[in-house]
Amino acid sequence: MLTFLKNVFKKGELRQKIIFTLGILFVYRLGAGITIPGVDIGSLSANDATSGIFGIMNLLGGGTLERFSIFALGVSPYITSSIIIELLSMDVIPALTRWRKEGNTGKKKKDRVTRILTLFLSALQGGVLTYAFDSGYGILVNNSIWAYIYVVLIMMAGSLLAIWLGDQITIKGIGNGVSLLIFTGIVSNLPSSFLQTYDNLVTYDSGMWLDIAWYVLFVIVYLSIVVFVVFTEGAIRKIPVNYASSTGVIMKTKEQTHMPIKINSSGVLPVIFASSVLAAPRTIVSFMETTDVTNIINTIFNYQEPVGFCLYILMIIGFTFFYSNLQIDAQKISDDLKKNGGSIPGIRTGIETKNYIKRVLNQITVAGSLTLCIIAAIPIMTPIIWTQTENASISLGGTGLIIVTGVALETVKQIKTYITRKEYHGYIRK
């Protein structure tokens, strides 16, 4: 670790990239604390206005929605747009499917369409959020159409600015900008969450030391979960690959070439989508009058209830299989291997290679989906099994854990790759 940090600060260009990245993140967090003028933050904070689907948006934004800041939407419109465009490129819209196969040129075209869609989605999300919160909690100081339009425009501008800041990190800094913005938002709430948990668990009476022991045990269990998530995020299945030389003879090296496939190639998207699908009906009925129907909906779509929990788990498994096959195109991998003279030992090139990759992907996705279910279920099951933590509040639940560990591991990997590349180029020049 010390050697790694020494190498990081020894490289002048890398040091500048890290400082630039930290500067952009500081600007983003600064804006996250600025409430939109004309919004009554007191009436918003006094209500449970960040539950359901809004709670997911608030988590990803690091509390920006709870404060109704200029970055209230964060990068969520861009993420939603990216997912929609990616889904439509799966043989739904021919143009998008064609762009997907055109490499960097097609990627630029898709990115342009994604940003246009982001503009419309930010307007839609901003309008829905403002209307919902104003109808339910009266957040607008001046309840006029112009005040409504003004707040929506500020939210749109804030979302586009957040995306631009993320782009600057990706281009001039280190790591994926959008992911780091989400990472910073989630991590920024950790200190207050742990302090709140301490206040909830520890009572200053004769049993204080026992309460402190419970809190220490809680932290140890939490850190153990973090280690488990780090392990699962880095777990891969290696498929051996041989490449033929120009003479047709199989090249043999001391270290066999392999193709790595992550156990959890879908990332956190299945959990976010499953949570959003369950939260949407409850969020809608929360603005309605309480009836038998609304009570039934709240029970069915509440993942803390048996039926809702089963739905939650089933949706995570289904979305994991869907997104894994979306992320890893077996046909494309098979074609690339054939084009470059590569083959999997014992498997014929072409259709057999494609079927083999699909079979392996489905096998490891079973493990990946079950892992996601365990991580997502921990925050739900812990208060039931361990009653002392019933009132504990930790913002970094299963969804946040996967995001934070995934982004952290990917950023460290990029830094290590950068250092290795620079050292290799320096060696070549010598």
Label every model-predicted segment:
Residues 1-430:
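N-terminal cationic and glycine-rich segments that engage phosphates or anionic surfaces
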